Regions:
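Cofactor-binding active-site loop characterized by glycine-rich and histidine/acidic residues
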Residues: 1-125, 129
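Active-site capping/gating regions of soluble enzymes
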Residues: 129-158, 167-179
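Metal-dependent DNA phosphodiester-chemistry modules and their immediately adjacent helices/loops
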Residues: 4, 8, 155, 181-203
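Hard-cation-handling environments
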Residues: 192, 203, 207-302
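Short glycine/threonine-rich loop-to-helix capping motif typified by GTGT followed
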Residues: 70-77, 109, 169-176, 222-226
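Non-transmembrane, aqueous-exposed alpha-helical and coiled segments at domain scale
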Residues: 36, 41-61, 73, 105-116, ...
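Flexible glycine/proline-rich, aromatic-decorated loop/lid segments
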Residues: 89-95, 107-125, 161-194
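Conserved thiamine diphosphate
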Residues: 116-142, 189-211
Length: 302
């Protein structure tokens, strides 16, 4: 409550060009930068453990960072340090950094000491691909290459997408106040679509009329979706955890009137203690360990 609606998360199924069905989930993510990172890895690891016999090739976590956030938020360093640990690894994460060279109003030179925002990737000796955000084909090639590397080696991969932010950080930010020279240059710079269309036209792959038709088709689709959404009088939110919680019930006032019985039968406690503190007969323990085990057992049995 109080956060932006597009942070709610979403799950859907898609069919790839190869005819494969893939389930995609955008994890609910609060406006606290990078706080969702360990949640995403936890979801991935849980699925690997529960559904895929820990086969890292079956689930792939993807994180989309900002350049200022990945370099400045400590939680990023924490999850990357866990990337290859036995109890936490997920078979590699694809890190895509939208590097717009500014963090809200902070110039990148004032935001970090490292040369690149992706230098954190050196911790795990991960490959880092620096890609021109205006080169659509280079980005597509890099995504495929990063995925192939991840699937083969089970390691994290970083993509530093060097680009720019067309407008302010949000509706209340006027970037020309804080970065006037940068935004003067950005205002004169053609957008990636225009650059790619001109490239395809120069190569004889695309005609101008076809490009206009494709743009109109896309705009018409967006407009149709807007009109469709306006017909919905009340939005419903389906809990993505519903199936996991269906066997549980909500607590009632009656549940809190009296304290529950949490005691354990003495016989059961003694049985557990015996199982825990009985040393295997086929192993030889040092005297200090034997003494410690006996002392702990006595705490329960005496």
């Amino acid at each position: 409550d109080g956060d932006v609606k597009y942070h709610l998360g979403y799950t859907c199924g898609i069919k790839t060009d190869a005819g494969k069905d893939i389930k995609m989930t955008l994890a609910p993510n609060p406006s606290h930068l990078e706080a969702v990172d360990p949640v995403v890895l936890g979801i991935a690891r849980a699925k690997l453990d529960k559904e895929y016999a820990n086969d890292g090739k079956k689930v792939c976590p993807v994180m989309i960072h900002g350049d200022a956030a990945i370099a400045g938020q400590g939680i990023v360093y924490e999850v990357i340090q866990m990337a290859q640990l036995k109890g936490y690894k997920t078979g590699g994460t694809i890190h895509i950094v939208i590097n717009n060279q500014v963090g809200f109003t902070t110039n990148y030179r004032d935001a970090r000491s490292s040369t690149y925002c992706t230098d954190i990737g050196k911790v795990t000796l991960s490959p880092v691909f620096h890609v021109n955000g205006d080169d659509a084909e280079a980005l597509a090639h890099t995504i495929n290459l990063a995925m192939e590397y991840r699937q083969k080696y089970g390691k994290d991969v970083f993509i530093d997408l060097l680009c720019y932010r067309k407008h302010g950080h949000n509706e209340g930010d006027e970037p020309r106040y804080t970065q006037p020279l940068l935004y003067k240059a950005i205002s004169k710079h053609p957008d990636p679509r225009k650059i790619y269309v001109e490239k395809l036209m120069s190569e004889g792959v695309l005609e101008q009329q076809m490009a206009k038709e494709m743009e109109k088709e896309f705009q018409d689709e967006l407009q149709a979706r807007i009109l469709e959404s306006k017909q919905i009088t009340k939005a419903t939110v389906t809990s993505f955890l519903k199936e996991y919680w269906e066997d549980y019930r909500y607590g009632t006032d009656e549940d809190f009137i009296k304290s529950p019985e949490t005691g354990v039968a003495k016989e059961a406690l003694l049985k557990v203690a015996k199982a825990i503190y009985t040393q295997p007969k086929d192993l030889k323990f040092i005297r200090k360990v034997e003494k410690e085990f006996a002392k702990r057992e006595a705490m329960i049995t005496d």
